[in-house]
């Protein structure tokens, strides 16, 4: 049974975009949380 590479070709850009978005949002969220914790202290 051969693997259908068309699925990988279609999903690859979606996975890359999603991981890039999670990385950027995660970095911004961490900065916001750190700023909030710094204000509390």
From Swiss-Prot:
Coiled-coil stretches: none
Positions of transmembrane segments: 7-25
An annotated GO BP: photosynthesis
Keywords, in A-Z order: Membrane, Photosynthesis, Photosystem II, Thylakoid, Transmembrane, Transmembrane helix
InterPro entries: PSII_PsbY (IPR009388)
Record's keyword annotation contains Nucleotide-binding: no
Membrane topology per record: Single-pass membrane protein
HAMAP family: PSII_PsbY
Protein name as annotated: Photosystem II reaction center protein Y
Gene source species: Nostoc punctiforme (strain ATCC 29133 / PCC 73102)
Lineage: Bacteria, Bacillati, Cyanobacteriota, Cyanophyceae, Nostocales
């Amino acid at each position: 049974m051969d693997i259908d590479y068309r699925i990988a070709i279609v999903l690859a850009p979606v996975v890359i975009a999603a991981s890039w978005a999670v990385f950027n949002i995660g970095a911004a969220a961490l900065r916001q949380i750190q700023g909030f914790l710094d204000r509390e202290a």
